[in-house]
Amino acid sequence: MTKMPKFNKHPLPGDSITWRNGGFTLTARVEFDDVTEPGEFDGYSEEDIKRWEADGWCYVGIVVTAEYKGWLLCDPAARLFGLECGLAEDSGDYLSEIAAAMLIEEFQVAKAELAKLRTITNTEE
């Protein structure tokens, strides 16, 4: 298995990482989450909420797409939203860890999708 890429220390919506393995290319991109708000959860300090209101941090989602040798298999293959971005200094590590788990899981999904496509192609010949 190839080394898993990581987001930079302070990722922003629009940033992405790409992982290539065995002809597959999986991309995890950060997208802005305009639905989730800190008031929906317990545990945020008043200061954290004020920083969120002042755009000091935001919620994001990670969206994964999968290709095989340039052919798009799944877009999106997976989506996960409601993730904190910029609240802590280690946002890049936090999002990279989540993206890595998603990429590994979706790699298996992409292989299954490719197998289905090959079966369909072989039965129609």
Identify the meaning behind each predicted range:
Residues 1-125:
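Acidic interaction surfaces
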